[in-house]
C-alpha cells in the first residue's frame, strides 16, 4: 500500500478534516489500525 497516502488519511482524520468513512475502502482497515495504535 501507499505509505504516504495512508499517513495523509491518518493526519486528515486527526485534524478533523475527514472521517474514517471518507477513506477509500481498500485503505480503511490500515488507517483504522494506525489511529488505534496511537
Where do the protein language model's features map onto the residues?
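Viral virion structural and adsorption modules
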Residues: 1-38
Amino acid at each position: 500500500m501507499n505509505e504516504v497516502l495512508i499517513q495523509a488519511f491518518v493526519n486528515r482524520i486527526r485534524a478533523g478534516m475527514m472521517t474514517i468513512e471518507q477513506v477509500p475502502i481498500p485503505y480503511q482497515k490500515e488507517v483504522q489500525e494506525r489511529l488505534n495504535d496511537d
